Design a protein with these regions (language model features):
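Active-site-adjacent structural elements in enzyme catalytic cores
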Residues: 2-344
Length: 344
């Protein structure tokens, strides 16, 4: 019995009509593919089935994908990125049926899938034996997500396989939000980069652990914590130890870092002795930066963060000062990425 007085079987069966809506939303996305994208996703699916790597757009950032069930293909992801082998990958799916083949789904996790998929929510659940240990980073759990772009969904659907995909860049660097950045960084060592334009959100997915009685936020991201709490009508907790945190990618190693130092500060707190610096934020700073990028709000700040970091590292400035946002809504994910980019 769950805390609402219903059995898990009842909760699952009551939600069955909503499954079609997930499929309909995914189908509607895929229907928007251009003829060129159809051709490229067919080619990409062939590469995935053959054990190769394909870079593709999601609504969050560009992903570097491989067959999640092929340990050797997954190994190529780690090698291409220079990614630590104990940093797990997210499994991207195109249907609930595919998800059920990979992980054990409880009724609360199913509710979140029905509410937010396709979308920027990754859910950590007990993994089934079919998922290789290498894909899981050696953990008993796996994170699953249904991405919300036509290209990503079509690539998964046409390959007939779940696709393991971290961000399509060298590990530790700012995540790519356009195809040109992917090509510049790893385009010469992978067979295909599918261009889907700029990503819609610009930050990675929210990762929620649903293995216990209470949901736990492992990584803030494109879906605010408050939205998950509203859907479940319960508090989303924060992780209490490193063992749980490591169930999510992007939480234990330095990530998103530009090639010049990044410091976090308030707009009016730039050191008076600062020279040859760049600014990033929603407000105008004191002093005279070499270059500044001002965003209209935190949503735009989040969407353009990684692109802005790459722009400023090439500006000739010696250091970047960035405004630290309030820790609510998308600001929570933005603060997380800035803190990690600064080495925190």
């Amino acid at each position: 019995m769950n805390d609402q007085g219903h059995s898990e079987e009842m909760s699952a069966s009551e939600s069955m009509p909503e499954r079609a809506s997930i499929a309909e939303r995914a189908a509607a996305r895929m229907a928007s593919l251009s003829p060129e994208q159809r051709e490229l996703t067919e080619r990409g699916a062939e590469i995935i089935r053959a054990g190769g790597l394909v870079a593709f757009p999601t609504e969050t950032v560009y992903g570097l994908g491989a067959n999640a069930l092929d340990a050797e293909a997954v190994k190529r992801i780690y090698e291409t990125k220079g990614r630590p082998s104990d940093n797990p990958l997210i499994l991207h799916v195109s249907s609930i049926a595919m998800t059920e083949s990979l992980v054990e789904i409880n009724w609360r996790a199913r509710l979140l899938m029905e509410k937010f998929w396709p979308g920027p929510l990754s859910i950590v659940l007990p993994a089934k034996e079919i998922v290789p240990a290498r894909t899981r980073g050696g953990l008993p759990t796996a994170a699953v997500r249904m991405p919300d772009t036509a290209v990503a969904l079509a690539l998964i659907e046409k390959s007939g396989l779940p696709i393991a995909a971290p961000s399509a860049n060298i590990s530790g660097r700012p995540s790519p939000t356009d195809a040109a950045t992917v090509r510049q960084e790893i385009g010469d060592i992978i067979p295909l980069v599918i261009d889907g334009g700029d990503t819609r959100l610009g930050l990675e997915s929210t990762v929620i652990d649903m293995t216990g009685e209470h949901p736990v936020l492992l990584r803030p991201g494109g879906l605010p914590k408050e939205a998950v709490e509203a859907a479940l009508n319960m508090e989303v907790l924060l992780p209490q130890d490193q063992k749980m945190i490591r169930r999510s990618p992007g939480t234990r190693y330095r990530h998103y870092a530009p090639s010049i130092p990044l410091r976090l500060t308030a707009p009016r707190a730039i050191p008076v002795e600062a020279e040859n610096w760049a600014w990033l934020g929603t407000e105008i700073p004191n002093g005279a930066p070499r270059i500044k990028i001002i965003f209209k709000d935190d949503a735009e700040y989040a969407k353009e963060l990684f692109r802005a970091l790459r722009t400023l590292e090439k500006s000739g400035a010696q250091i970047i000062y960035a405004e630290l946002p309030e820790e609510n809504g998308i600001g929570r994910a933005l603060k997380d990425r800035l803190t990690r980019a600064a080495g925190g």
